[in-house]
């Protein structure tokens, strides 16, 4: 009997990395792979809280496991320190991860590990693969332009379209497979595949969003979410809160529990009275489904790559407020190259927020950007269809790397 290939996936411990890794895992599972999805212990415990024990137990051939990261224990419902995680990835994670792979290889419940797929920021996974004589294939979860920027860190890309960036990367290293948007490829996972309905979220998702959206006029709602990491000063948070409250449009605002606790002085009873009946504040939601809802007309985002892809797939225009990493590059593409949005200034005020929302939802220029967003949606869908560039690259990845 042929042994299933066994892929061990190791995402960076942040929500924006966990989601695309799960999408890739499901795609590989649909192609006959046994999957082991590896979290650090902190996030494994958070998944227990948000998704329950049945989810974490996984499926017979799709397992969720954990290993210690060497960081101090914490009960906070928030992403760990990026500095601490980056340091641990360099200094303390290799040994425990190597031991985990050895246990997987010795287990009678799974085939031997045939490949390790670490996040681009979890390079110890490649070191472990090299030491154990196993195929190592890093997965970069952000944009091609972001990858290019990191690849040549001091040479920032200022000109060119995404395709030119991809061509430049492949000229340097031909073994780059551009398989996004994974959201659309994932939709092709067969209905009978047992992993199809798996989702991963470190926060409990609020189900009220869709009932509330169903009551709103099409294209009227501003959806606001700054991702799993971004933090604001109380002054910034106050400007956002009152800018949204006075913009004249209904809005859904995702405010993580850690951000909500830090800004209790802003989200007062008086504030909730001000926005009553025309706004919904939640701690987390199913973003892809919210963006796809006809009630949403505008996305106010930090321009993380997952959010960038999800808004393109939904065909929705944006206001960008980039925070870290390559988010400014993503914002530049969204606003300057693809022309589907505008960027807020770093020290944005409530008045600017009101002006930008009105420009995007009430002006002719806003309508033009909305039409552009629909054009980019069509291009994304075409890339993921049979014969499209992403579909073909995923087939090449399976044939040339994992089946080689």
Label each region the model flagged:
Residues 1-404:
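Glycosyltransferase specificity loop/lid
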């Amino acid at each position: 009997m042929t042994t299933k290939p066994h892929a061990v996936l190791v995402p960076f411990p942040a929500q924006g990395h966990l989601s695309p890794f799960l999408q890739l895992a499901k795609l590989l599972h649909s192609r006959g792979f046994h999957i082991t999805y590896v979290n650090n212990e902190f996030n494994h415990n958070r998944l227990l809280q948000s998704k329950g024990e049945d989810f974490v137990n996984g499926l017979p051939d799709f397992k969720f496991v954990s290993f210690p990261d060497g960081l101090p224990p914490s009960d906070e419902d928030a992403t760990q320190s990026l500095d601490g995680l980056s340091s641990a990835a360099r200094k303390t994670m290799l040994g425990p991860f190597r031991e985990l792979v050895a246990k997987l290889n010795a287990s009678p419940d799974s085939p031997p590990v045939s490949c390790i797929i670490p996040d681009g920021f979890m390079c110890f996974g490649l070191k472990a693969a090299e030491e154990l004589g196993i195929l190592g294939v890093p997965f970069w979860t952000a944009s091609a332009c972001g990858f290019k920027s990191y690849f040549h860190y001091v040479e920032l890309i200022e000109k060119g379209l995404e395709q030119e960036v991809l061509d430049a990367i492949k000229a340097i290293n031909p073994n780059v497979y551009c398989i996004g948007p994974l959201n659309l490829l994932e939709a092709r996972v067969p209905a009978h595949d047992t992993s199809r309905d798996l989702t991963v979220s470190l926060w409990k998702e609020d189900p009220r969003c869709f009932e509330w959206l169903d009551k709103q006029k099409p294209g009227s709602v501003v959806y606001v979410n700054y991702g799993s990491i971004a933090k604001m000063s109380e002054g910034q948070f106050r400007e956002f809160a009152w800018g949204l409250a006075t913009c004249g449009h209904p809005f859904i605002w995702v405010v993580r529990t850690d951000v909500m606790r830090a800004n209790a002085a802003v989200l007062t009873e008086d504030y909730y009275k001000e926005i009553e009946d025309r706004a919904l504040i939640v701690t987390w939601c199913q973003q892809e489904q919210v963006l796809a809802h006809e009630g949403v007309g505008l996305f106010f985002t930090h321009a993380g790559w997952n959010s960038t892809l999800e808004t393109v797939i939904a065909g929705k225009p944006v206001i960008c407020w980039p925070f870290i990493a390559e988010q400014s590059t993503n914002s530049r593409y969204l606003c300057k190259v693809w022309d589907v949005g505008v960027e807020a200034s770093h020290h944005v005020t409530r008045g600017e927020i009101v002006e930008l929302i009105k420009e995007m939802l009430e002006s002719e220029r806003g309508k033009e950007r909305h039409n552009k967003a629909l054009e980019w949606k069509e291009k994304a869908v075409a890339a993921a269809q049979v014969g499209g560039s992403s579909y073909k690259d995923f087939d090449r990845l399976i044939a040339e790397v994992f089946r080689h």
